[in-house]
Amino acid sequence: MTAADLPDDAVLVCIDMQVGFDDPAWGDRNNPEMEARVADLLAAWRAADRPVVHVRHDSAEPDSPLRSDGEGFAWKPEAEPVDGEPVFTKRVNSGFIGTDLEAWLRERDHSTLVVCGLTTDHCVSTTTRMAENLGFDVYLPADATATFDREGHDGERFSADEMHRTALAHLNREFATVVESADLSATR
């Protein structure tokens, strides 16, 4: 899979690239290079004049670092939208629920999405699953996503890397084609 294999109008969908995910309350995160890989994808998409959309989370939880009235709602500097790139704000894990994302994509006849951002096992996964269920062809660059350590119902701890790899395995070949960002960032 290379950038040349994608349709010219493949949409880069950047999920929750927000400063609030730098809050230590989230715990340990995997993939410290995720922001750089997202920046590479953004640069490639913009240079090729391909469509880019941004989805961000506005949490209703009073203590969330992702509330719209807090500093954590801001974009990470590596992934700030530029003029003309639509922004969709969601209140749940899916970028499609409560937003106009699906309508925007359908009005422009986009059928292929490349999904990146945070977090692999929550909002990236949910948006990817819904996109496929809605009939979109989805590519997921593994190194342009990341997640955090999690605790199971019984107190067992799972590392961020375990969660990341497991989430990608669940999505691969059923909801998305999992690739590496370098394949998609290559010059067309």
Curated annotation (Swiss-Prot):
> What InterPro entries does UniProt report for this protein, alphabetically?
Isochorismatase-like_dom, Isochorismatase-like_hydrls, Isochorismatase-like_sf
The molecular function terms of the Gene Ontology recorded here are: hydrolase activity
EC number(s) from the headed UniProt entry: 3.-.-.-
Membrane as UniProt keyword = no
Which terms are listed as keywords in the entry? Hydrolase, Isopeptide bond, Ubl conjugation
Q: Where is this cross-link: Glycyl lysine isopeptide (Lys-Gly) (interchain with G-Cter in SAMP2)?
A: 90
> Per its UniProt entry, what is the enzyme's top EC class, as one word?
hydrolase
Q: Which domain of life is it from?
A: Archaea
Membership in a protein family: Belongs to the isochorismatase family.
Write down what this protein is called: Uncharacterized isochorismatase family protein HVO_2328
Name its species: Haloferax volcanii (strain ATCC 29605 / DSM 3757 / JCM 8879 / NBRC 14742 / NCIMB 2012 / VKM B-1768 / DS2)
